[in-house]
Amino acid sequence: MELQRNDFHHPYSPYDIQLQLMRALYSCLEQGKVAVFESPTGTGKSLSLICGSLTWLRDHKRSAFQTAVDNATCDDDEPEWMLDFARRESSRMMTEKRKELEERLEKTRKEEEQQRIALENPEGPRKKQKYSIPLTESGGLSEDQFALDDYDSENEEHSKPRDELAHTSELSPSTLELLERFKGQISTAKPGSDDADNDEVKIFYCSRTHSQLTQFAGELRRVKMPWSIPKDLLSTDLTGEEELEERVKHVTLGSRKNLCINPRVSSLENATAINERCLDLQQPNVNPQHRCPFLPSKEDERQVLQFRDHALSTVKDIEDLGKLGKKIGICPYYASRSVVKDSEVCCLRARSSIDLVPDEWQIVTLPYPLLLQRSAREALNSSVKGHVIIIDEAHNLMDAISNIHSVTVTLSQLQTSLSQLTIYGRKFKTRLKGKNRSYVAQVIRLLSSIAAHLRSLLESGKAPEGPVLISELMSGKGVDQINPYKLSRYLQESKLARKVDGYVEFTRDPSDKQASRSPTVPVLFHIQGFLLSLMNPSAEGRLFYSKEQGDIQLKYMLLDPTNQFRELVEDARAIILAGGTMSPMTDYMNHLFSYVPASRLDTFSYGHVIPPENLIAHTLVRGVQGSEFDFTYDARDSEKMIMDLGRTIATLCHVIPDGVVAFFPSYDYLGRVLNIWKKPMLGEQGQTVYNLIGQKKPILSESRDMTVTTEELLHTYANTVDSGRGALLLSVVGGKLSEGINFSDKLGRGVLIVGLPFPNIRSAVWQAKIQYIEQKTHQQATGSEASRQLAAKAAGRDFYENSCMRAVNQCIGRAIRHRNDYAAIVLVDRRYEKPGIQAKLPAWIKQSMVGSSVQRPAGATVQSLAKFFASKST
């Protein structure tokens, strides 16, 4: 039966496409689907995802609650009055427990409301008036802190729990950094630690950026959801809003950098330094007087409970939790963990982490690395089995999976690590015994072998980039006897990376520390990640070298994200991928979900909330001087065509009001275009195309090495547009302005896409990717050898085109941000006329595409655009 509008508890009157999305989402969650949702930015997608998923979750919980009550009976053979009593008693106990929490949170909320009128003391009461001192000062850490503990590889399974060791030894460097932030444990007794009777279904909400998770928290504040207890089982003394609403319990978890309130730690120069200092202050051999005074301990249970109730009473963002921690005098980073058990919604900022997922959570939001990497989920004890996963802004999901499981190491990093290990080895030579001495020697031999091969590549006349074989890296003396898996276990267990980095930092001249402290994790973490890549199936990934500015880097690239994501798909109840521009969707179906039965797969692409007359899209094949726009690799440097492009853009800027954003395929190509535009035109008395465009609209340009920040460039652009002259902003596909930046209203009346931003097909990485797709398709195809080869070539070509068109669609999505917005989209290249290319555009763009013809002159397009904007000015 189709759900009605009010069933989703949307805070506003939803548009029809929002209703369609929420209905489809509800159905997919109920049926356990794997689905891809495309809903343009500006259509209220995030709020629709929240309302649709929370409505389903509350319905599901009510059903589960009723089932639990019905199952609480003694025996079906008992008298009916006894069965009824058992059901009522079970209902009363479960309801009272939940109501008690609601009443406590309501009391706290009212207290906060009363305090809001008072000026808060920014310092707040301190729990203990003392601060940790720098580790290098007298009374801090000694050299003994950095010595390795004895290690016995024959008894490795007893030195650390096997499951924890297996999980953490397989993490990528970026995820190891996340996990290191959570190694310290809170010693406080867990308040309200009653175990749930069963593992309630949760929603894992995953997004990429700080701003997206901040937006999620903001949208959540608007939502009011009904009780998760069946209405006929609720206590009769609930009235008014209390009867209708059960608050959504939410907590935002952040990194130490976001939440640390110890000024001696939070003032350090980067996140890595903050994390390391915090962990160092918790080591057992640190003098208690020098430990962090805000770290929760057993005697701080009252403050932890107070923090929990305040955090849950209203939806708070990361800044609110920081202020709350200062006011109570307790570390909000660790205290926020106590909130998780009773929360329904748990937000994590990008580069944040969780250390467990209690049964009572209903919604868990987290950054990509901790969801997409199996070893991270296991190390955090966070199973997704039977739960729902919603990944928002998922247009780059396949790339994200590949990047998370890819590792890069440079020759300079290898040389630095060798130097640090040598210094460390000399200092602790007499204390390195047995297996420690053996493994440290193995690390040095392996790093030396890899460094020697990279050095030979750097000094050779070989191409700037190319593939590398594992055997080439392991060619050093004695390296073939090394067991990479045992060595990687040793690196993680012994904490050699932290010991070496800590000692080097400890002995560095204090005057050099601020300038020389690296903003990244210790290089041995990168080495560890690289060692793990050597154990991956060779068919799924490749090794590449790349020479850059006197250095050379070695990269393991995961080519196929399918198997890395498969466990999530098979374990989860439902998987939802959502984004503003998910087209083209064939990659998800053919590659990421190729093993999923068709009956479980679904795709949805919704239109925009704007009326059809508010968007016009054109392909532009020829310029105002008749040049055919062909920006293929072999033709794109034609000066005649580039000059005509400039004249055409000048003409378009004359008819498109306010702000126009033009996207080019790359920084290098934009630079070449600008150089040609600034040349004097023949017979024009020194006039340049650049000046010609500037007469219509002032020009601003993005560059790889901008002297201003992106925010400053956007601020200048907005001010120029507001001045009344409008502006032309030259940008790059995949650059700083192509994703996450909104060009709404006057800032984006026109969006021009110049050329198609195909990746460099000649690069070693892309040749390997396409070769892998072709080989995989050939193996899976049926029929004759000729037909299998054709299918393989078609699959490789489709994969290559999809990568390009996803980038194009992201740029197009920068315009049109709300219902009353309007804009023109112009696709400048003859290849946009191809049906296969147009088929990869989002549905909401295709339906606004003006019928095109290769023979149409540019003047006809200009007239069409002039008519479109004239209709908006009346």
Curated annotation (Swiss-Prot):
Cofactor note: Binds 1 [4Fe-4S] cluster.
GO cellular component, as recorded: chromatin; nucleus
Biased composition, class Basic and acidic residues, residue ranges: 92-115, 156-167
GO MF terms held by the record: ATP binding; ATP hydrolysis activity; DNA binding; DNA helicase activity; iron-sulfur cluster binding; metal ion binding
Disordered as annotated region, ranges: 92-143, 151-170
Family matches, as InterPro entries: ATP-dep_Helicase_C (IPR006555), DinG/Rad3-like (IPR045028), DNA/RNA_helicase_DEAH_CS (IPR002464), Helic_SF1/SF2_ATP-bd_DinG/Rad3 (IPR014013), Helicase-like_DEXD_c2 (IPR006554), P-loop_NTPase (IPR027417), RAD3-like_helicase_DEAD (IPR010614), Rad3/Chl1-like (IPR013020)
CC cofactor: [4Fe-4S] cluster
A GO biological-process term: establishment of sister chromatid cohesion
Keyword field: ATP-binding, Cell cycle, DNA-binding, Helicase, Hydrolase, Iron, Iron-sulfur, Isomerase, Metal-binding, Nucleotide-binding, Nucleus
Residues that bind [4Fe-4S] cluster: 260, 278, 292, 331
One Pfam family named in its UniProt record: Helicase_C_2
PROSITE patterns (UniProt xref): DEAH_ATP_HELICASE, HELICASE_ATP_BIND_2
Residues involved in ATP binding: 39-46
Subcellular location: Nucleus
The Helicase ATP-binding domain, residue ranges: 4-444
Highest taxon, organism lineage: Eukaryota
Family statement drawn from the similarity comment of this UniProt entry: Belongs to the DEAD box helicase family. DEAH subfamily. DDX11/CHL1 sub-subfamily.
PANTHER family: ATP-DEPENDENT DNA HELICASE DDX11-RELATED, DNA REPAIR DEAD HELICASE RAD3/XP-D SUBFAMILY MEMBER
Entry function: ATP-dependent DNA helicase important for chromosome transmission and normal cell cycle progression in G(2)/M. May have a role in changing DNA topology to allow the loading of proteins involved in maintaining sister chromatid cohesion in the vicinity of the centromeres. Has a specific role in chromosome segregation during meiosis II.
Descriptive protein name: ATP-dependent DNA helicase chl1
Native source species: Aspergillus niger (strain ATCC MYA-4892 / CBS 513.88 / FGSC A1513)
